[in-house]
């Protein structure tokens, strides 16, 4: 009944243009939070694992055929993570889920960077192959860490829920459009820059950069992102207007 009433009120409410939303102090801050959430969602580096796992595994010594076959493990981790996420977002506060996600990803990617730095790079030879001295567990360790990373990301995703709850009714259309647009632009950028990054800088630097970005995202969730779960949509709008005016 609440959603029916909210939908009725939104239909009757004047819709703001992007210019109106941007020129009003409190709604501009909400737009910026939405944009940042969308961008950080892609800057987790999740698509580097979903799109390029065979390339990553090949870079640590797996054969091309095995690299493609082992990609199924991240798919399994993604499915389990998505299922777990349904329970997580219903059980915990939105901010807490976001903090869990970013903290977990920061740890996973920092660990992955260290494995590349100390377990992979010292054994890589000039022709791109690896010394027989490289511990046999290292490639499998990379696979396990990437699978954990994918699981954490999929089980802790709250961005799409925030998109539906964060924006007041009068700017929900333009707010969602702008935030989602920025999300997909960032998706394209990360997808395009990852191959040359790992080729030129190596896995340690590449994933070190993504870990640092996720640490910034963690601070953003802790310091900036408001809670929305325990309030109605009207209460969220009233609270945000008071906070950001």
Briefly describe each language-model feature range:
Residues 4-245:
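Alpha-helical transmembrane bundle of multi-pass membrane proteins
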